[in-house]
């Protein structure tokens, strides 16, 4: 089926979203045009406002509309802990754990094959933040449990070690409520390597 230039442009615009292929983009575009024009207008308005009004926090680099995000402007948070994550969505995930320290958001993970070195993901800015705020006593490396995430955590841990700072890594393993026969071998191996004695 051949689409008009404006419909084709809308379909192509939807395809920039992660996980949205040609068919899904077509369905989205046609749904808005055929059945929900007011929803499409609200989407366009909200998208325009967000693109113009949302930037990065001056300290942690998460997404925010202010100079400082709510976590960085909260004076009650623990200034001795810094949690390093790969992206803004990770901040929201860690917040659900009850963590009350500070954050630093990288722009992804090290991936030399994709041309992403330390500068591209913000490691120099991380080290500058740590140098400027001398209250940090522990840096929690909460990068993803992928090969790239592990490499990123190891690289940062080495830099921190050279500065005499404590680096810790979040534990990986069997999810709460998970069944062992459904867990992949790599995850189970991490669980065994990170086992702890039972406190009685």
UniProtKB/Swiss-Prot annotation:
A zinc finger (C4-type) spans 57-72. InterPro entries: DNA_Rcmb_RecR, Rcmb_RecR, Rcmb_RecR_Znf, TOPRIM_dom, TOPRIM_RecR. CDD domains: TOPRIM_recR. Keywords: DNA damage, DNA recombination, DNA repair, Metal-binding, Zinc, Zinc-finger. Residues 80-175 form the Toprim domain. It comes from the Bacteria. It holds the Pfam family Toprim_4. The keyword Lyase does not apply. PROSITE patterns: RECR (PS01300), TOPRIM (PS50880). The keyword Zinc applies. GO terms for biological process: DNA recombination; DNA repair. PANTHER family: RECOMBINATION PROTEIN RECR (PTHR30446:SF0). Belongs to the RecR family. May play a role in DNA repair. It seems to be involved in an RecBC-independent recombinational process of DNA repair. It may act with RecF and RecO. This is Recombination protein RecR. It comes from Pseudomonas syringae pv. tomato (strain ATCC BAA-871 / DC3000).
